[in-house]
Amino acid sequence: ASYKLADGLNLSGTFGMNTTLNKSTNLTPFGYAVDGKMGYAPQGALSKGKNDRKVYTMDVKGDYAKNFGDISTESVVGFQAFQTITKNMSGGGQQFPGPGLQVLGALGSNSAGSGFSEVIEAGLMMQTRVGYMDWLYATAGIRQDANSAFGADFSTITYPRFNVSFIPTAMTGGAIGPMSTLRLRMAWGQAGQQPGAFDQYTTFLPWASEFGPGLSPGNVGDPSLKPEVSTEIEFGGEVAFL
């Protein structure tokens, strides 16, 4: 949805949901090893799995543009949020009691498992571009992100950016020697990637055996884990010849 609130002032928003449901079944029928030479599950085996993933998105932004003589300005303020919910279930086992019974409850030995995770990521973005007489442009922006993977003790992380674009051929009003168009630019900025839902924490997994229930190591974890931050510097240009 998009709305024009005033001259040069616009508000837009996008909301969506993406859902994916995967189901899998792996069946080895009872008595498949008729020659007696197959060692795996001669009385049959069955495994089933289901993975349900939903991603909810929200993107709202407002932009404002205005000219002051030879100076043009464009400003954007936006907010983004993502919620990812993942649910999975699995079960399987071996030893059917006879032909025709191809359900998990008929297996002589079986196991089951399930999992659930929810990650919420939100970000606030602000950017302003200032231009002078169509030949000099400067853009400055900042983004603040928060992620539920770090728990209640983590607040936000900031990613700034800045770039400049200079067009000498526009400043002179025509070609410079054999060059019909010349554009020079420089950019500096930071970006990052958030970790998974439980990457920071030490986790354990349930474990079942003939000796009884127990736990096995899961994720090793890192209490000092922070968002990944990368810094990029770019110099470039574009040129066209007559």
Model-based region annotation:
Residues 1-28, 40-242:
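Extracellular/periplasmic, surface-exposed regions of secreted and cell-surface proteins
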Residues 34-35:
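N-terminal, polar/charged subdomain of small-to-medium soluble alpha/beta proteins
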